[in-house]
Amino acid sequence: MKKKVLFISSTGGHLNELLQLSCLFEKYDYHIITEKDKVNEHLKETYGEKIDFLPYGTRAKLFTYIFKYLYLCIKTVYYYFKLRPKVIVTTGTHTAGPMCILGKIFGSKIIYIETFANTNKKTATGRLIYPIADLFIVQWEEMLKIYPKAVYGGSIY
């Protein structure tokens, strides 16, 4: 029986980084969760039942973002208990935060990959997940100074 692994990220560059790990999908009972937007709707055709979407939220409209984020948290609880992953792999950002916290509470292993785009400072999600991650991977050696318990994994690309 294959280990259940959840791959989760927000849309855009974070999702692009996450999908670089697709060579791992066949090794696990995998599932992907990302934000739904027009750019990645086609992924349902590629991954079928192996992908689900959370609401896309932008902080540009703070009032609506608060409600969307609350809804995202509720959907996160639903997906976590539906999937019950043993491992959660994420490249960030806010979409992944609630899932990683929930996963940690219920015993999932957390693997966080800090974004390739950041070479010299902590990201907001990195700050949140670093203390609870079972494995925290950085893509730039310079980031080991900022995250001393991290592992340098090289570029995901």
Regions from the PLM with identified roles:
Residues 1-5:
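Extreme N-terminal starter segment of soluble prokaryotic enzymes
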